[in-house]
Design a protein with these regions (language model features):
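An active-site-proximal structural segment forming one wall of the substrate-binding cleft
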Residues: 1
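Beta/alpha (TIM)-barrel catalytic core signal, keyed to glycine-rich beta->alpha loops juxtaposed to Asp/Glu
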Residues: 10-181
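Acidic/hydrophobic-patterned starts of short beta strands in beta-sheet-rich repeat architectures
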Residues: 4-5
Length: 181
């Protein structure tokens, strides 16, 4: 069995009851223990909770939003919806796909082997903007001076974990060195 089965994104053009009935079948068959959502808006999470209740099935137990110092949008409605409905929050990418490690300098070409240096579209279309890189460098300096040498990636992860709505984070290191750091 799977402990947690995630619905990774919303269903355009699909009735909400259909995927929830499929999840209920998996739950009843013992193939999954719990289910959760990733990348859903707060109103949609609330709708899922209510629909699950109408179907007499368990609701989601966990939500996996993209949340970090550079992307605080989940604070607008997702975190509140999760708290209201008793859903655990386990954000992914607390260091913004590496930008909040401080390894990317504004105006500089990213090093080969890095996510941005490899041309990963997810980072290049989202976090890899001059203003985000400048914010990361300012935070890096702050951590080195004011926080007595705390690494920016540790500070950024601790910042996410300091939110009362957050249960844990998904760190997502790309290399063993990043994991041991």
């Amino acid at each position: 069995h799977l402990d947690v089965y995630y619905l990774h994104r919303d269903f355009d053009g699909t009735r909400l009851e259909d995927p929830l009935r499929a999840l209920d079948d998996l739950l009843r068959a013992g193939k999954i223990r719990y289910w959760g959502v990733s990348n859903f808006r707060g109103w949609r999470i609330a709708e899922m909770v209510h629909t699950a209740r109408q179907l007499n099935m368990p609701g989601p137990v966990v939500c996996q939003p993209y949340y970090n110092l550079l992307n605080r949008l989940p604070e607008v409605e997702v975190l509140e919806a999760c708290c209201h409905h008793g859903i655990g929050v386990v954000p992914y990418s607390p260091i913004a796909r590496g930008v909040l490690s401080g390894k990317y300098a504004p105006g500089a070409k990213p090093a080969e082997g890095t996510r941005a240096g490899r041309g990963d579209k997810r980072i290049l279309q989202t976090e890899f903007r001059e203003e985000s890189l400048a914010i990361a460098q300012t935070l890096k300096t702050h951590c080195e001076v004011k926080k007595k040498g705390v690494a920016l990636q540790h500070f950024a992860t601790a910042w996410v974990l300091a939110n009362k709505a957050v249960s844990a984070v998904i760190a997502g290191p790309r290399t063993l060195d990043q994991w041991t750091d």
